[in-house]
């Protein structure tokens, strides 16, 4: 299973490289995916993913909830040394990796065992949370500096959310997934080396903004502009619930009210970025 998913990652990196690009969903306005990796660099990144899976003894695993974080750790960790020219090129690759893994859960519910689901979450919610949280936690391993974290985490969350239709989710699964994806991103910020509490508020603002803006990218039968109010509530509740799980020097309950404001301001600021038939930002 791991080798198949890594093969799909390789294909995704190739199909979005060398001036070609794709989108996170079938909507013509949705987020564009591209990267500047050479074929040799793609091989290095893919080989690192394979090595990480092997090191975790997951070569024969049939559990995507176990496998996918290792693929992210390996592939993202390689980006620091593969020779990318700047942080924006690195972030582009991280977006392709996130999109590829979300697409790889489509049609594989049998590889998402309920025994691996987190308490209070479905297996699908768990794997999406793990994709997001592992990617955010490994942004520094990808060679990004602390000043890039807000932008990178926003982009990654925007990609994962926009890709949910490509991941085969049904309209009834979207709300829970949004909650867990946003929570996973926010509560992983404390895993990033060199990232300080002074930058936390802006990053949380960026994450809820990215998740909210991507609501217009999701292509799922039965999902429409009528669902947006509920979806934005899921984004903000996920981010807010994660605030209590952050452990950082200088961060305490004293920070909570200002962080909740950042959750709200991020979501509110992105309402105008949502493009959907029948949507008018004044409605929310």
What are these regions (language model features)?
Residues 1-284:
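Non-catalytic all-alpha helical scaffold/repeat segments
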């Amino acid at each position: 299973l791991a080798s198949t998913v890594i093969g799909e990652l390789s294909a995704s990196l190739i199909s979005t490289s060398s001036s070609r690009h794709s989108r996170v969903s079938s909507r013509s306005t949705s987020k564009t995916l591209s990267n500047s990796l050479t074929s040799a660099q793609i091989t290095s990144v893919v080989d690192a993913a394979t090595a990480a899976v092997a090191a975790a003894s997951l070569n024969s695993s049939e559990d995507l909830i176990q496998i996918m974080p290792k693929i992210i750790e390996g592939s993202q960790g390689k980006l620091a040394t593969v020779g990318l020219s700047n942080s924006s090129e690195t972030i582009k690759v991280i977006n392709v990796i996130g999109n590829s893994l979300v697409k790889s859960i489509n049609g594989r519910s049998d590889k998402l065992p309920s025994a691996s689901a987190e308490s209070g979450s479905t297996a699908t919610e768990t794997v999406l949370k793990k994709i997001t949280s592992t990617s955010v936690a490994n942004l520094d391993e990808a060679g990004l500096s602390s000043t890039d974290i807000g932008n990178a985490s926003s982009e990654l969350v925007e990609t994962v959310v926009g890709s949910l239709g490509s991941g085969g989710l049904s309209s009834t699964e979207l709300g829970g997934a949004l909650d867990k994806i946003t929570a996973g991103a926010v509560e992983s910020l404390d895993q990033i080396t060199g990232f300080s509490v002074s930058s936390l508020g802006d990053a949380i603002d960026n994450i809820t903004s990215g998740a909210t803006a991507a609501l217009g990218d999701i292509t799922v039968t039965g999902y429409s502009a009528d669902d947006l109010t509920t979806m934005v509530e899921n984004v903000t509740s996920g981010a807010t619930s994660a605030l209590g799980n952050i452990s950082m020097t200088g961060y305490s309950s004293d920070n909570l009210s200002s962080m909740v404001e950042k959750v709200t301001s991020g979501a509110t600021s992105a309402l105008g970025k949502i493009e959907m038939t029948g949507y008018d930002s004044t409605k929310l």
